[in-house]
Amino acid sequence: VKRAIFLGESLKWPTDGQEIPLKVRQIFTGPNIPRPQVALAPHLARQLLLDRPNGSTLACTLDGETQRFALDRLHHHLLPLRSQNVRDGAILIVENRTGEVLAYGSDSGEPASGRFVDGVQAKRQAGSALKPFLYALAFDERILTPASQLDDSPLDVAVFGGLYHPRNYESQFQGLVPVRVALASSLNVPAVRALSLVGTEAFLNRLRHLGIKALDESADFYGPALALGSADVSLWELVNAYRTLANGGEWSELRLTFEKTPLSPRKKVFSPQAAFMISDILSDREARSITFGLENPLATRFWAAAKTGTSKDMRDNWCIGYSPKYTVGVWVGNFSGEPMWNVSGISGAAPVWVEVMNWLPRNGAPARREPPPRLVREKIIFSHGSVSPREEWFIQGTESVLLEDKGGSYHQRILYPPPGTVFALDPDIPRDLQKIFFTMQTPQKAVRWVLNGSELPSLGKATPWTPKAGKYHLALMDGEGQTLDSVHFEVRGASVDPPQEEGEALVQGE
């Protein structure tokens, strides 16, 4: 009051010593008293009230306790990631049956700019988070089963303007792997091979049916990289797509308000059988152990299916998953688009996801899902012996109890280098520090490397070799001198030694 009177007098405004205290009292004791508080869902409020008159009141589906817990856990896990150039994140929690949104929010380390960015609706590259929908389509089209074998070895795909070289996150290859392992462990090369079987156009159309709206380019534009999530999606779209799997393959709109409108009709995107098999794979700790280990942030105290994703250059990482009752999605990255420093979905988004998911069923853990009709479970045997016999789910009519390796000694194949590879020596790096690793699939018997006719010291699946300029023939041979596999490759670049010609003896091992 004193400040207001002083300001009025200094500006020579007519002031009433009685009127100003009265007005101040009305402001701070009336029904519109300004209360210092943190808005729980500012982005959602802005979205819902955008086209409504001032003073509107609208009841939304958010659960206050769930919203507070989700935002608190998101903020808590983002703090230690600041040292790895991670500032922002978003979380979305929905109820599967009704589609009601229970938590919706973002957290930003840059409040001045982050408050204007809705992390739930922002478009980001999906990374590996799209793979479950690719394999679900392959199951429905009877192209693949969870037991089908896919080749995880170096692959060069011709695309417009050159070659596309998909690589796994760990830059290692596993050879022949079942689809179950390929999806659960998020192997990239098998996903690209699966896309070539399904067709990019068919996969693109299925993603559109899942409500992913930014896919307005042609199949040729996305190419084989679509299998690895080159498309832009929002957390909102991705969570609802995973909710579709939780609901047996049926998609419907998410619900933000309790207005007198019926639940949106459901449309069938995948069969219940395909949705169940994908869910079973995404909840399989053993199948994901190749990449993530048996104990990892995706392991919940009850049945839940989950998938991570990391976009190119580590600009975005995701963890999306569901129990029979809830679907939870977490995005971690930077609203500015800057890359993170060595942060993947398993280390960035997954810890938030698993803590929230474990907290949600606080009134009792959900029961495991029951298989739908027309699914059968058969014991399968892999003839090449690299995978132990196990039981697997099949859609009736697709089962096969013996999966043969038609390539004979295919499991002995050289994984790296691929045939015809041309390596370039780097003149700025000392030659003895440059290495090429010869790798093979896990052998079933004693094998040896032979380079240009001379045996190399073998160090197991991967043998390092110091390259020099020349042309080479690399063979993988058994103890009886039979060639199991061979490749030709070339090394180019500055070298103090004369170029090596194919056929000359050269032994270099580390």
Whereabouts are the PLM-identified features?
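Active-site SXXK
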Residues: 1-9, 70, 99, 120-152, ...
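Non-catalytic, structured segments within soluble enzyme domains
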Residues: 1-68, 72, 205-220, 224-229, ...
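Second-shell loop/turn segments in exported
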Residues: 2-14, 31-35, 54-61, 80-81, ...
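Conserved catalytic neighborhood of penicillin-recognizing serine enzymes
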Residues: 4, 10, 33-50, 97, ...
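A short, well-structured edge-of-sheet supersecondary motif
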Residues: 20-24, 84-113, 205-210
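Soluble, non-transmembrane domains of envelope/secretory-pathway proteins that act on or interact
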Residues: 24-40, 154, 158, 304-510
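A penicillin-recognizing enzyme superfamily signal
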Residues: 60-83, 91, 95, 104, ...
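A structural microfeature
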Residues: 102-103, 148, 457, 485
